[in-house]
Amino acid sequence: MTEYLSVSTLTKYLKAKFERDPYLERVYLTGEISNFRRRPNHQYFALKDEGAVIQATMWAGQFRKLDFELEEGMKVLAIGRISIYPPSGSYSINIESLVPDGVGALALKFEQLKKKLAAEGLFDQRWKQNLPQFSKKIAVVTSPSGAVIRDIITTVQRRFPMSQIVLYPTKVQGAGAAEEISGNIRRANERGDFDVMIIGRGGGSIEDLWGFNEEIVVRAIFESRIPIISSVGHETDVTLADFVADSRAATPTAAAELATPNTKIDLINWANEQESRLFNRLTHLIKIRRERLEKLSQSVVFRQPERLYDGHVQKLDRLCERLTVLTENKVANMKHRYELSANRLIPTYSKIVESKKNKTEQLYQSLLLLDISKIKARGFSLITDENGKIIKSVSDVKKGQALDVELTDGQVKVEVK
């Protein structure tokens, strides 16, 4: 009897076959990107050629490793694993690696970034700054070792020795190079006293020169207020730094020549030009001052100098009158306040004196009451023993004891019975 399989059973069987097949565990495909729309995380698109289409999935972690931007219609080389999706019965490739077909990833990234920045206008001629004819201070962003800095120093000293060179030691290739290049460009701008800046390095592969193609470097050059001369690689090497820089030189020597005057004749012409500008400026200033002097000489003040002081004299008189009035008002006000204070203080002072007088009289009378002679005059006597001790109680004496009794008109001796 014929046994019929369910669709699910068949799909599971095929899925197991696919997963166990060593040829399908790692497949190398070439094709054209189709139906690509960038998503926040995982990417879903198709690979096609003239005869077939296969769905493709690329997980977020793998997609972030790409050195170029995927585009619709781009030819690529893909490495991945074939799998079946049971609900739809369709097969697809899970891509692990993806590179452009026929062009290097860096070359493609170069063209994509160049297109993006050009669309923003970063390479437009209208943004280019003119190089100064005579640079007193030159910033150099390059490696501290190697022929580049030596060639620049030699050329500047030969052509315009009065120029000062300030080197910003910079890593020019490898990891972190772009960050150092852009950082030193910004640091030179923060200093603010450079006439021109040279950035560059010697020749090398596209990988060696790539630091000068990074977006952060291009934007740092674009934002620089200092005119920048780019000298990266050999004459045949082209970087994005060359497109955005204010000027490009094929060699470090050529860059130094752009930053300095050509010959002694240029220096003489420049000196003559400065002399002419100074003469014209002084002539113009003298003319303005002469016209102003002539205008002033026709004024009333110069024809009648005494009138120059009329206004000041009148103002001084008004100020003196005002000062006199203010002084009189101030004195009158103080006199009035004094009189008010005196009227309040005199009655108060009289009351205080009278009160103190009464209290003194009371104290005096109290003291009189305590006078011993007054007490004896009222019939009281003072009794003391033989030692002069005052007798205050019966318990202070004993029988037969001799006592002194002091009266108002004399003293008598008595004996206790």
UniProtKB/Swiss-Prot annotation:
From the UniProt record, list the reaction(s) this protein catalyses.
Exonucleolytic cleavage in either 5'- to 3'- or 3'- to 5'-direction to yield nucleoside 5'-phosphates
Entries under InterPro entries matching the protein: Exonuc_VII_L, Exonuc_VII_lsu_C, OB-fold_nuc-bd_dom
For this UniProt record, give its keywords in alphabetical order, as a comma-separated list. Cytoplasm, Exonuclease, Hydrolase, Nuclease
Localization: Cytoplasm
Name one matching Pfam family: Exonuc_VII_L
Say which enzyme class the record assigns.
hydrolase
Record family assignment: Belongs to the XseA family.
Name used for this protein in its record: Exodeoxyribonuclease 7 large subunit
Which gene specifies this protein's sequence?
xseA
